């Protein structure tokens, strides 16, 4: 049985991520989407919120599970019996980064096999960070996210804006 893991912060999960998940689910017997924490990023959603969002987005994919963990991806792979580490790349910069991560993972565990998927050209410009930035500036990103995640992002954006306005009002006093 071919088991793969697709780790990421998914804050939020985009249609680019979902496309990779669908493609991976067609290739592997089982695909575990691992919602991880990236300490270098400012998360809008908690890990539990992201897990719930991703579960809803992949509900129709019977061979896909959604998990979470902390620590090294290679340790998680060993824990769940994953043979392959699935990654997506949008451009040359992503490839260079993923190549280095793959080399480190192989150093940590020489059984780790990284499979790199090229992003569908219609999603090559997408990143969670870019979508959050566009949303904060009032841009319409609904067509780039699963519907459930767009709703959650819009609600979170309103909450963040209300906090900002409240803070500005308090500072003005």
From Swiss-Prot:
InterPro entries: Cyt_trans-like (IPR004821), PPAT (IPR001980), Rossmann-like_a/b/a_fold (IPR014729). Substrate binds at residues 9, 41, 73, 87. Signal peptide: none annotated. Keywords: ATP-binding, Coenzyme A biosynthesis, Cytoplasm, Magnesium, Nucleotide-binding, Nucleotidyltransferase, Transferase. One of its GO terms (molecular function) is pantetheine-phosphate adenylyltransferase activity. It catalyses: (R)-4'-phosphopantetheine + ATP + H(+) = 3'-dephospho-CoA + diphosphate. Belongs to the bacterial CoaD family. HAMAP family: PPAT_bact. Reversibly transfers an adenylyl group from ATP to 4'-phosphopantetheine, yielding dephospho-CoA (dPCoA) and pyrophosphate. This is Phosphopantetheine adenylyltransferase.
């Amino acid at each position: 049985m071919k088991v793969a893991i697709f780790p990421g912060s998914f804050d939020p999960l985009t249609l680019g991520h979902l496309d990779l998940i669908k493609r991976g689910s067609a290739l592997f017997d089982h695909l575990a989407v691992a919602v991880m924490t990236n300490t270098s990023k400012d998360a809008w959603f908690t890990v539990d919120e992201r897990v719930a969002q991703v579960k809803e987005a992949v509900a129709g994919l019977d061979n896909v599970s959604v998990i979470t963990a902390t620590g090294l991806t290679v340790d998680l792979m060993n824990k769940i019996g994953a043979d392959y580490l699935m990654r997506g790349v949008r451009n040359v910069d992503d490839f260079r980064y993923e190549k280095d991560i793959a080399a480190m993972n192989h150093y940590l565990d020489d059984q780790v096999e990284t499979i790199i998927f090229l992003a569908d050209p219609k999603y090559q410009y997408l990143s969670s960070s870019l979508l959050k930035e566009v949303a904060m500036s009032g841009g319409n990103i609904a067509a780039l996210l699963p519907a459930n995640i767009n709703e959650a992002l819009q609600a979170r954006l309103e909450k963040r804006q209300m906090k900002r306005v409240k803070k500005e009002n308090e500072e003005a006093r």
